[in-house]
């Protein structure tokens, strides 16, 4: 099934005839299969491991250096993430590079005109399915400096480093703050700890700094988050393993604590499947006596899921907006 963005691209198949194509950005479907027969080559690059892990022809990573006659970028709601990906790839190309940018209007795709107009000619060529499609031709190669995209902030003695797409990238969010406050010196954490959906790594790094005896693993689906968490550990001289995993897809160990501030937004839509998978599968990755501790908006229907998976749960602490839940094996 094609996304709305790919449905718009499918209205312009002659643009792909005989060309080498690169699909990148927030690619979420198999539009590539529709254009293979008319293109000379189709490559796919993704920052999203939950997509890339399902297909052998998708390259997962941070920076894309794949050349193509025509780049096709799928816009996402995070503008800084889009800026990073577009400018990084265009800085590797040559004058005359052709590109299509497709995105939903509600995700702010219109701002691509302001972003790319200093570097060439950009024009909207279609508007359908609540999306905008733009054509761009490069006239001035942008100077890409990755360091300009890194942000940092302090949490007590901890320095958090992050790239745009990492959750908690510019400050500690209220949910994570409540979650961290739920850990006291009485917890005396030891053993294996997993920070699942780690974002910039603030939760796992904070726990490792406060409880040095733990063996820390952090995971996320986004390459920017993985690099951010690695940088946060290195900056604070902390040890830990950071891996790409779609919930538990690439996690084989068992843990004494699984901690998470799980996402419930999929791009600009609300989706609960990730948290459902986390709660329902966590028991299989906990040692006997192990704990799952998560924070969530108070209105979300997670208590029933926790009771279904674990038999019972506790509310460790709460605020007007969030609750911290605990469930044990």
Curated annotation (Swiss-Prot):
Gene3D superfamilies the UniProt entry points to: Vaccinia Virus protein VP39 (3.40.50.150)
The enzyme's E.C. designation: 2.1.1.172
Subcellular locations according to the entry: Cytoplasm
GO molecular function list: 16S rRNA (guanine(1207)-N(2))-methyltransferase activity; nucleic acid binding
GO cellular component term, pick one: cytoplasm
Principal location class: cytoplasm
Name of a matching Pfam family: MTS_N
Enzyme class: transferase
Catalytic activity: guanosine(1207) in 16S rRNA + S-adenosyl-L-methionine = N(2)-methylguanosine(1207) in 16S rRNA + S-adenosyl-L-homocysteine + H(+)
Keywords: Cytoplasm, Methyltransferase, rRNA processing, S-adenosyl-L-methionine, Transferase
Subunit structure as annotated in this protein's UniProt entry: Monomer.
Family membership noted in the UniProt record: Belongs to the methyltransferase superfamily. RsmC family.
PANTHER family associated with the record: RIBOSOMAL RNA SMALL SUBUNIT METHYLTRANSFERASE C
Role description: Specifically methylates the guanine in position 1207 of 16S rRNA in the 30S particle.
Name of the protein this chain belongs to: Ribosomal RNA small subunit methyltransferase C
Originating species: Haemophilus ducreyi (strain 35000HP / ATCC 700724)
């Amino acid at each position: 099934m094609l996304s709305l963005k790919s449905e718009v691209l499918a209205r312009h198949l002659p643009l792909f005839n005989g060309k080498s194509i690169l699909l990148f950005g927030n690619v979420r479907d198999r539009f590539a299969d529709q254009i293979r027969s008319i293109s000379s080559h189709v490559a796919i690059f993704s920052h999203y491991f939950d997509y890339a892990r399902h297909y052998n022809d998708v390259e997962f990573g941070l920076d894309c250096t794949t050349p193509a006659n025509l780049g096709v970028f799928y816009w996402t709601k995070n503008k800084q993430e889009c800026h990073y990906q577009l400018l990084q790839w265009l800085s590797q190309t040559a004058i005359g590079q052709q590109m299509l940018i497709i995105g939903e209007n509600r995700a702010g795709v219109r701002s691509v005109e302001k972003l790319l107009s200093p570097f060439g000619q950009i024009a909207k060529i279609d508007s359908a399915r609540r999306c905008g499609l733009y054509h761009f031709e490069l006239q001035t190669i942008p100077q890409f400096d990755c360091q300009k995209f890194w942000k940092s902030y302090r949490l007590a003695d901890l320095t958090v480093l992050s790239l745009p797409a990492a959750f908690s990238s510019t400050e500690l969010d209220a949910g994570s703050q409540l979650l961290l406050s739920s850990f006291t010196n009485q917890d005396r954490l030891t053993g294996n700890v997993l920070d699942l959906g780690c974002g910039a790594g603030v939760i796992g790094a904070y726990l490792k700094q406060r409880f040095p005896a733990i063996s820390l693993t952090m995971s996320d689906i986004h390459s920017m988050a993985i690099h951010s968490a690695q940088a946060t550990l290195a900056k604070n001289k902390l040890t830990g393993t950071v891996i790409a995993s779609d919930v538990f897809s690439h996690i084989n160990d068992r843990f004494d604590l699984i901690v998470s501030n799980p996402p419930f937004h999929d791009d600009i839509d609300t989706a609960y499947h990730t948290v459902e998978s986390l709660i329902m599968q966590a028991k299989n990755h906990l040692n006997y006596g192990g704990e799952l501790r998560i924070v969530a908006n108070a209105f979300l229907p997670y208590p029933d899921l926790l009771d279904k998976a674990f038999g019972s749960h506790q509310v460790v602490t709460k605020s007007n907006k969030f609750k911290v839940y605990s469930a044990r094996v």
